[in-house]
Structure formats: C-alpha cells, structure tokens
Amino acid sequence: MVSVGIVGTGSYVPDKVLTNFDLEQMVDTNDQWIVSRTGIKERHIAAPETPVSELCYQAALRALEDAKLAPEELDLVIVATITPDFVFPATACLVAERLGAKKAAGFDLQAACTGFLYGVATAAQFIATGIYKNALVIGGETLSKILNWEDRGTCILFGDGAGAAVLQPVEEGYGFLGYDLGMDGAGGSLLTMPGGGSMHPASAETVAKKMHTIQMAGSEVFKFAVRIMGETALKALDKAGLGIGDVDCLIPHQANTRIVDAAVKRLGIDAGKVVVNLDRYGNMSAASIPVALDEAARSGRLNYGDIMVMVGFGGGLTWGAAVVKWSKRGV
C-alpha cells in the first residue's frame, strides 16, 4: 500500500483569553490551586455567536496553505468534534462548503479527546488503498458552550480551538508507520454529556438538571488516563517495529500536567522530547493534539525523518496512538 503522511498543519484559537484570575471571580477557586493540579494558566473561549465550524474553517485554511493545496483538490474532509454546529448536518459538510471543497466526501467523527487520532487513522486508510489522494482532518471544539460554569471541577479545565492536518501519499517508508486504537464502553459514564441525545432528549427538565454540560468522574478518569497513555503508545510503536528509544517527539493529549508527567515517567522518555502547551490552552478535546502538532511543526521541533508519536485518551472511553516518520522537509 501507499505510504501516507502529514504534509500540512494549521491551527486556530479564539481571541478571547480566560485566565485563572478571571475564574477566581466566577467560582470558588484560585490560580495556585488550578496550576498545581492541572498546569493550566489560561484558555481561549469562543464568542457566543461563534460555532465550531468557524474555528475548523480557520484551522483548515492554514493547513491547506501550509500544504500548498487548493480546497477543490480535496477528496475527503473529516471533522472530529463533540461540539458540532448541529446534530445534523455534519460540521464537515459546513466546513467543506465554506472552503469550496466541491468534490470532497466528508463526515464527522466522534471519539471525544481521541477524535483527531481516529480521524487521521481513518483518512490514511482511504489514501493508502488508493481511493483518495488528498484528505483534510480537523479536530475542533467549542467546549465552553457545554460547560457548567458553576462546577469548578470541570469549568477550569477546558478551552476552545481547532487544529487541522492535510494527508497525502509520501515517499515510501515515511509517514504513518503504526497505530493503536481502542475503547471500553464500560467507562462511558465516567466522562459524558448525558442530555440532548435519544436517551435523554432535550427538555426543560434536562436543561434544569444541567444535563447538557460535561459530567466527569475526575479521579477515575485520571487513573485510566495514566495507565492507558503509556500502554497505547508502546503498542503503536511495537506495530511500527520501534521502541521508545527511537522517539524524537511525543505529542500527548493536553489534558492535565499530572497526567502527562505520569505518562512520560511510565514511558521513560526524555521530557525534552514532549510537546506541552496546555498551560496556554487547557484541554481542547479533539483539538488538543492537532494544535500541539501544528505548533511543534511550525516551531522547528519536527524535522525530516523524525519519529513522532501522537497519543491520547478520551470519553467513550477511547484511546489511541499514531507513530509517524516525519516526511515534511523544512523550507
């Protein structure tokens, strides 16, 4: 099969910044408490009238420009999100229309914080098998719109943003080398938004009970995350015929400093190889990894031939990792 790699990246976050000091005025918390437990100092918040499709569109423009690809050349658009503009139509359809990707197929994919990894793994198969040539994968979220701003256990954690990647055939032996994806529905209730679906359709009661906001069993999710991040990264590396010593760059889901630090320690990887930006953005769910990827690529942390691992976990419960031999050459 054809080797498939990332040939362009882009990201976008809203202008408005919400700091920990701002949160002190909203809920019973303080900057020191938030930083010591999460590592987060600030996050970006979309305006009430701004849908996730706008963030996805802006990230997509930047990724296409980086890849030197015109929108009409796209064959496939995948949007990973838990905060779509609508239940239907898919946000991918809205973004593709605005871009002018007239010949592209497209759909939304929902795997919470693991969504971008599921997205690139899916898109890569369409290209590897020769069905498509150019794919755009976007992870975007407006989590601020589904937060209970009175719940200090969750409202301090999340932010809004979008990241995108363009996938194409690349030279043999480069690009995606291995994946590991998984899920465990038994843990679905640990991280969920219960209202609005066919189980609990929207009603005055579901709104009053704040069922349209993120509900999280923090300690249970923490224990799961620390264990699974290391396991899935090692499995993906094994499938690629590599070990942790071969890794030049690790891009973990930016959920919480303590989770990232614990996973890094378990893996035994040099902390200097790990990309961390959650202090500036918080947890952006499906946007977390692609925004960090874009920053790593643009800052020179990824060089031609580097072995890069993206790894994450999320609601579902879901998890995943992808191993990439970086195929993009510097300008």
Swiss-Prot record:
Residues 254-258 are annotated as: ACP-binding. This is Beta-ketoacyl-[acyl-carrier-protein] synthase III. One of its GO terms (cellular component) is cytoplasm. It comes from the Bacteria. HAMAP family: FabH. Belongs to the thiolase-like superfamily. FabH family. GO terms for biological process: fatty acid biosynthetic process; secondary metabolite biosynthetic process. Pfam families: ACP_syn_III (PF08545), ACP_syn_III_C (PF08541). It comes from Desulfitobacterium hafniense (strain DSM 10664 / DCB-2). GO terms for molecular function: 3-oxoacyl-[acyl-carrier-protein] synthase activity; beta-ketoacyl-acyl-carrier-protein synthase III activity. Homodimer. The keyword Transferase applies.
